[in-house]
């Protein structure tokens, strides 16, 4: 079968498998490709290549498949640490997740941790695959495990009572040994994923935002800021705000340039130069953003979920304590911040993931789910995501 070209006519959704080690995440991924994509065997997926995201090495396997309704990009990680890093750095963006839980074991520590991470990094929806049901003879026991999973999801503010739970066996699907818990369950799972995981809003439909990378002054024309449009559209003549680092100011975009050509608008993904009215060369700087007025506010204090690199990953060699003051790299610039550890946590070791509170020395344009790198003198020592804004 020849390689079919990527069909753009279906909505595209990014998903991934999460759950405890050995509960069957990779087998399930293989089983889904068997019925909905180009079949990838367990070993092909398990030998996940390493990639770098925000200076951190992560092993992730990517597979693609499609249902009649959608095209999916699916990520599966070999090790628990890879999941933690992946979800925090957003190396593989997840619009939804399939939580794989063994019916024989029920929820285990990493089941809980992955649900917590999904909550912290803002995975919008979860569908559950209760795997290895052929290892449980007792229907009541199966019901008990399902109840446990629902309670666990609810305890992390997911709608545990409404989340679809599909019971089956990834192995039965791979081995064609029992159609009901094999192929049928996989098809039922994907129908649930189609129905329950919402299609993400395309970046172009969101309010305009441009992280400023550079500032120039062009004699006779004024000040130009450059960068890649993160989301939305900006049209010539529109009013925008400059947010972050200094007090918010309003200006008007009087021109948009791309590859030295004048355009009437710039949109998500474009690298543009935007000419802005009435702003001097030193009235704007790298690290600020241009955005639709009122859409983004500057903040200093936030709660973050962070992963701290190990020594082997090029990170710190020693733990850190409350009042640790690294730089936080948001979009295009470093800002110093003061870290406060949660009550009862005395120190954070390299390799830990942790929820901390941060206060920056200057405000930065930020929203929940914004990702950042933690740096010391230009060297990445961690990665994080804004879990919630305090002020």
Swiss-Prot record:
Top-level EC class: hydrolase
Region (G1): 19-26
Subcellular location: Cytoplasm
Gene Ontology cellular-component annotations: cytosol
Binding-site list for Mg(2+): 26
Region G5: start-end pairs: 169-171
Domain tr-type G: 10-201
Record keywords, A-Z: Cytoplasm, Elongation factor, GTP-binding, Hydrolase, Magnesium, Metal-binding, Nucleotide-binding, Protein biosynthesis
Keyword Cell membrane listed: no
Annotated stretches, region: G4: 131-134
G2 as annotated region, ranges: 55-59
EC number: 3.6.5.3
Gene3D superfamilies: P-loop containing nucleotide triphosphate hydrolases (3.40.50.300), Translation factors (2.40.30.10)
Keyword field contains GTP-binding: yes
Family: Belongs to the TRAFAC class translation factor GTPase superfamily. Classic translation factor GTPase family. EF-Tu/EF-1A subfamily.
Protein name: Elongation factor Tu
